[in-house]
């Protein structure tokens, strides 16, 4: 777990099954800043699902296609551990 948190944007990492489904809390890659979840096509492009996000000073909100992502947000993302690592290491 610690190795995953050292690199990339991951803030927290929960492996639900060894090498399989994983949930991470992470800063969004720059390419998502200013775009909605729908516009960024995270699931189809990267194979991971954004479940929700936390904006500074705001409560957790479940993500919808219309959820706008900013640089200060923290995303809650789930999927295959390998795909999540790739997504978290994007610039």
Model-derived regions, located:
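Cytosolic Rossmann-like ligand/nucleotide-binding regulatory domains
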Residues: 28, 33-91
């Amino acid at each position: 777990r610690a190795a995953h948190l050292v690199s990339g944007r991951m803030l927290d990492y929960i492996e639900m099954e060894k090498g399989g489904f994983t949930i991470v809390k992470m800063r969004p890659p720059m390419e998502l800043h200013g775009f909605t979840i729908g516009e960024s096509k995270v699931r189809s492009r990267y194979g991971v699902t954004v479940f929700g996000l936390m904006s500074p000073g705001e409560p957790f909100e479940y993500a919808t296609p219309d959820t706008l992502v900013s640089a200060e947000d923290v995303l809650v993302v789930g999927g295959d551990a390998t795909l999540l690592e790739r997504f978290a290491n994007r610039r």
